[in-house]
Structures are given as C-alpha cells and as structure tokens.
C-alpha cells in the first residue's frame, strides 16, 4: 500500500509537469527508519545488517523510478549519519548510495539525524563533509545541506568538491533575495 501510494504520487508529478523529484529518506521518516539500526529492529530480511536494512528503501525507489521517465532526474535525500555511535554510519550511507546508483538514482541530497536524540555540533555547512564523502565514493551529483546561509560558503563548497548543489530552505527565508 505504501509503495503503491509513492508510485501514484510519482505518476501525478509527471502528469502535472514536474521536472525532477526527490524521495525524502532522511530525518526519521520511513526510508530513514528502515536504514537506521536505531529504528529498525526487525529480525527478518528487512532488518539486521545494512544490506537488509536498505532492502525496502531500494524496492521503493526502484518502483518509483520505474514510474518516472528515464529522461527526468530522480534523487533521494538520505542521512549521511544518525549522529549516534549506534546509528547509521557514513559507511552505511555510502553503501546505500552505491546501491541507489545501481538502480538509477540521479542525485543525492545528504542530510543527517532524526533517528536519535543526538545533538550534533552545528554551524554553517556542518553536514557538508557527509555530502563530500558520499559524492566521492559514488561519483553521483550530490547536494549539501545544513545552515548554508551565506552564498560565499555555498560557492566554496561547490568549488572545493564537497558537493555539486546546495539545498536552501531557511537560508531563503532569512534572505529572500539571496544572490
């Protein structure tokens, strides 16, 4: 039922003219909850090691990708870490990224957290190193997020190879005329 709802949403996006779509798989939502050992305590083929934990997210993405035109990009936002020693690691994220690449993912949007009460040290660009690690391990265009409110920082992160794109949300709320 959940997979069908996602594929129907993809079909609606195509019908109304979206140019690209992104599956939100971070911050404790469904995909993130499967990937994280903090949330996924299953003892069947969908739990345990990262290969099993990423099984449903890959099944879901594949069905969504099949419903989306090949010529249009489709990406996934996922955690590069849970910010918890017992949680999803950056190596797990890289493993997931490589598997997504194999099933036709066009870009990644790398974030972190949501499955634990951990409070990481935050500051401008604090998650960019996660995007860089996944980008360099997978060779897939990757987006960085996390308090990137200054256009000079955004340019620096792209120029130094940390990412290919910057995701902006609050930055545009703070400064709607962001250059």
Language model features with spans:
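Flavin-dependent oxidoreductase catalytic cores
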Residues: 1-179
């Amino acid at each position: 039922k959940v997979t069908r709802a996602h594929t129907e949403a993809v079909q609606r996006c195509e019908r109304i003219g979206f140019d690209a779509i992104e599956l939100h798989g971070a911050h404790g939502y469904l995909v993130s909850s499967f990937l994280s050992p903090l949330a996924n305590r299953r003892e069947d083929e969908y739990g345990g090691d990262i290969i099993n934990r990423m099984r449903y997210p890959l099944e879901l993405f594949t069905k969504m990708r099949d419903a989306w035109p090949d010529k249009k990009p489709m990406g996934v936002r996922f955690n590069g870490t849970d910010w918890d020693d017992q949680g999803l690691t950056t190596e797990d994220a890289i493993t997931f990224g490589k598997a997504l690449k194999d099933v036709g993912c066009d870009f990644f949007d790398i974030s972190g957290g949501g499955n634990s009460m951990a409070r990481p040290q935050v500051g401008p660009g604090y998650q960019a190193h996660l995007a860089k690690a996944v980008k360099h391990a997978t060779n897939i265009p990757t987006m960085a997020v996390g308090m990137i409110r200054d256009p000079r920082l955004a340019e620096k992160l792209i120029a130094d190879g940390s990412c290919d794109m910057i995701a902006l949300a609050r930055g545009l709320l703070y400064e709607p005329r962001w250059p």
